Swiss-Prot record:
<feature type="compositionally biased region" description="Basic residues">
    <location>
        <begin position="1"/>
        <end position="10"/>
    </location>
</feature>
<keyword id="KW-1133">Transmembrane helix</keyword>
<feature type="transmembrane region" description="Helical">
    <location>
        <begin position="82"/>
        <end position="102"/>
    </location>
</feature>
<keyword id="KW-0812">Transmembrane</keyword>
<keyword id="KW-0813">Transport</keyword>
<feature type="transmembrane region" description="Helical">
    <location>
        <begin position="295"/>
        <end position="315"/>
    </location>
</feature>
<feature type="transmembrane region" description="Helical">
    <location>
        <begin position="568"/>
        <end position="588"/>
    </location>
</feature>
<feature type="transmembrane region" description="Helical">
    <location>
        <begin position="462"/>
        <end position="482"/>
    </location>
</feature>
<comment type="function">
    <text>May be involved in the transport of nicotianamine-chelated metals.</text>
</comment>
<feature type="transmembrane region" description="Helical">
    <location>
        <begin position="234"/>
        <end position="254"/>
    </location>
</feature>
<protein>
    <recommendedName>
        <fullName>Probable metal-nicotianamine transporter YSL9</fullName>
    </recommendedName>
</protein>
<feature type="transmembrane region" description="Helical">
    <location>
        <begin position="58"/>
        <end position="78"/>
    </location>
</feature>
<feature type="transmembrane region" description="Helical">
    <location>
        <begin position="402"/>
        <end position="422"/>
    </location>
</feature>
<dbReference type="InterPro" id="IPR004813">
    <property type="entry name" value="OPT"/>
</dbReference>
<dbReference type="InterPro" id="IPR045035">
    <property type="entry name" value="YSL-like"/>
</dbReference>
<feature type="transmembrane region" description="Helical">
    <location>
        <begin position="430"/>
        <end position="450"/>
    </location>
</feature>
<feature type="transmembrane region" description="Helical">
    <location>
        <begin position="642"/>
        <end position="662"/>
    </location>
</feature>
Length: 684
């Protein structure tokens, strides 16, 4: 019975992290209202002994495992960032891989006759936290968006004659300055809300659904029944990892040229292929489609049909009328401008609506909780298990003086270092950002605890527009992009830390070991992510709108900064009217979903997801929908087996295909080309 209960609470595939993440209905339904999830965590605890001291939760083998898992996922998410810009949350997958690595290590030592330290849920939690902190830098460090938007190629793509895109307003990527920038901005968020952790987790009892889901998964692993369950998942992961890796290896032999290989297979005919409608055999995106909700995947497909199936062919027919026929379609004054700015309109409409909604919800819940606290004072007595969790959570305190002094010290370093890297970024911009960071971080962390939506990218976009307009024409683009990264990093890490604290609270893990693991993982990420980025940047044609490595959000963010400087004068002819329409559609779609009954509202497409294919193309949306179709069919055939195995199989597909990128990039750097080109042409 207990095993069945745990299986029902097994976290569903995690949500897709778009610029604003939308929580999955399936995930929220199983985790809403912390009581049931916490009960599941308690039942899974089993044994009931005292947790090990915080120093024993941080182990050398755990840090090595964190480094391996974090580095592997950094490569995977960097590939996703530089192709479509869409990265699914991989926390559940990381927890599974951490368990696989360390359980395999302890079992191997036992077979060799060596006594190994027991592998506890606390160590598993610390390893997962450290690994996620490491690859989160690759996800949110701006390598496919605001930092890449600073390079010369994106500057040229935005139009050298575009108003606001002034000559010299670019900075080529460099390992040294990127590492320094990440180190300067990534740690302050760790310290901003440490003194409020008890308030957020214990007093307000915020659910943090992703953190709770990870805790339930980890607790489930560390039970007698969990071993059998984990063994099935490990076998599924290993099988599909190997299949995905060798399929990618096989494809490489046929990709020796432009538009060659299985990734350019005209599945629906050459006419559809010209409009990017084909299946490109990318198992990474098939796996991502298995993790993401059906609504996200269908929204992607709808956006692809609307843009590449209808709008772009129609606008192309107006060449010479709406825009000059003498300029290439890649110019921002041509078709590319419509693609970029309409995508921006959808992103801004969706982001602004969700920003206002979450802030309003946060204020309302803070007000309601303060009234309930006074009304119910003394009525509810915590159960024994909750008291035990609370005691562990408050035992190993992080001194407030250390958090405050660390925050001030890091602020001082950033105020000096960031203007030295970017002369357009004045020191007082940095001071203002760091003064506002605790308040913004609290709002974001509180909203994430209620809804599982991390609004950091929207705070960053608001900072981008404000700083771009404030800095003016000569410095606005660079100041806006850098300020966006600064605010986004400060706000995002605070919410991530609270998710981790929730996981630690439910697995009886010391908060001191959690924050140390987060700090170590952040250091790893600040070093590994720039190195990983440069591996891709040196080996592949990053930012080519006609190639595989489009990195679409670099151009999107630069165009946002240009809009902040110049306003609507930067738009091509009739583009403003289209942008108004799509901005209004994004707001209306969100309102409809929130106001309609759930059985109708859940079918309303997500504007953020619809906007991504506008720049990237339709092929990856088809991959994602194939992943959705696999999950849908599997649930019809065997629902309980699908709930158990989908995360493991999807992780195997993503990791196998993603890991092949490492040898492929080394072959490209060594100037070793594939021996064959498989291409298709019409018989006419």
């Amino acid at each position: 019975m207990k095993q069945e209960r745990r299986r029902k609470r097994q976290p569903g595939p995690p949500r897709l992290e778009l610029v604003v993440a939308h929580p999955r209905e399936e995930e929220m339904a199983g985790l809403d209202g912390g009581g049931d999830a916490e009960e599941g965590a308690t039942h899974a605890r089993g044994g009931g002994g005292a947790p090990p001291p915080w120093r024993e939760q941080l182990t050398a083998r755990g840090l090595v495992a964190s480094l391996a898992v974090g580095a592997m996922y950094s490569v995977i998410v960097m590939k996703l960032n530089l192709t479509t810009g869409l990265v699914p949350t991989l926390n559940v997958s990381a927890a599974l891989i951490a368990f696989v690595v360390l359980r395999g290590w302890t079992q191997a030592l036992a077979r060799l006759g060596f006594a190994a330290r027991p592998f506890t849920r606390q160590e598993n939690t610390v390893v997962q936290t450290c690994a996620v902190a490491c690859y989160s830098i690759a996800v949110g460090g701006g390598f496919g968006s605001y930092l890449l938007g600073l390079n010369k190629r994106t500057y040229e793509m935005a139009g050298e004659d575009t108003e606001g895109n002034v000559p010299g307003s670019y900075k080529e990527p460099g390992i040294a300055w990127m590492t320094g920038f990440l180190l300067a901005v990534s740690f302050v968020g760790l310290l901003a809300l440490v003194p409020l952790r008890k308030v957020m987790i214990i007093d307000y009892k915020l659910t943090y659904p992703s953190g709770t889901a990870t805790a339930v998964l980890i607790n489930g692993f560390h039970t007698p029944h969990g071993d059998a369950m984990a063994k099935q998942q490990v076998n599924g992961f290993t099988k599909y990892f190997a299949m995905s890796f060798f399929w990618s290896f096989f494809q490489w032999f046929y990709s020796g040229g432009d538009n060659c290989g299985f990734s350019q297979f005209p599945t629906f005919g050459l006419k559809a292929w010209q409009q990017t409608f084909f299946f490109d055999f990318s198992l990474t995106y098939v796996g991502a489609g298995m993790i993401c909700s059906h609504l996200v995947n269908l929204s992607l497909l709808l956006g692809a049909i609307l843009s590449w199936g209808v709008m772009w062919p129609l606008i192309s027919d107006l060449k010479g009328d709406w825009y000059s026929a003498d300029i290439p379609e890649s110019s921002m004054k041509s078709l590319q401008g419509y693609k970029a700015f309409i995508c921006v309109a959808l992103i801004l409409g969706d982001g602004l609506y969700n920003f206002v909604k979450i802030v309003a919800l946060t204020i309302k819940n803070l007000f309601d909780s303060s009234k309930l606290k006074n009304a119910k004072k003394g009525e509810d007595m915590p159960v024994l298990d909750e008291l035990h969790r609370n005691e562990v959570f408050t035992t190993d305190n992080i001194p407030s003086w250390l958090a405050f002094s660390g925050y001030l010290g890091l602020t001082f370093i950033a105020v000096i270092a960031i203007p030295m890297m970017f002369h357009e970024m004045k020191w007082y911009y940095v001071v203002i950002a760091y003064l506002l960071a605790p308040a913004l971080g609290f709002c974001n962390a509180y909203g994430a605890g209620l809804t599982d939506i991390n609004m950091a990218y929207n705070y960053g976009k608001i900072a981008l527009f404000i700083l771009a307009a404030w800095a003016g024409k000569d410095s606005g683009v660079v100041a806006g992009l850098v300020g966006c990264g600064l605010v986004k990093s400060l706000v995002s890490i605070s919410a991530d830390l609270m998710h981790d604290f929730k996981t630690g609270h439910l697995t009886l893990t010391s908060p001191r070991s959690m924050i140390i693991a987060q700090a170590i993982g952040t250091v790893m990420g600040c070093v590994i992510s720039p190195l990983t980025f440069f591996l891709f940047y040196s080996a592949f044609d990053i930012g080519n709108p006609e190639g595989y490595w489009k990195a679409p959000y670099a151009l999107v963010y630069r165009n946002m900064a240009i809009l902040g400087v110049e306003g609507f004068s930067a738009l091509p002819q009739h583009c403003l009217q289209l942008c108004y329409g799509f901005f209004g559609f994004a707001v209306a779609a969100n309102l409809t979903r929130d106001l309609c009954p759930p059985k109708y509202g859940r079918w309303v497409p997500l504007p953020m997801a619809m906007g991504v294919p506008f720049l990237v193309g339709a092929s990856f949306a088809i991959d994602m929908c194939i992943g959705s179709l696999i999950v849908f069919t599997w649930h019809i055939i065997d629902k309980s087996k699908a709930a158990l195995m989908v995360p493991a199989v999807a992780s195997g597909l993503i990791c196998g295909d993603g890991l092949w990128i490492f040898p492929a990039s080394l072959l490209a750097l060594a100037k070793i080309s594939p021996p064959m080109c498989m291409a298709f042409r019409s018989t006419n």
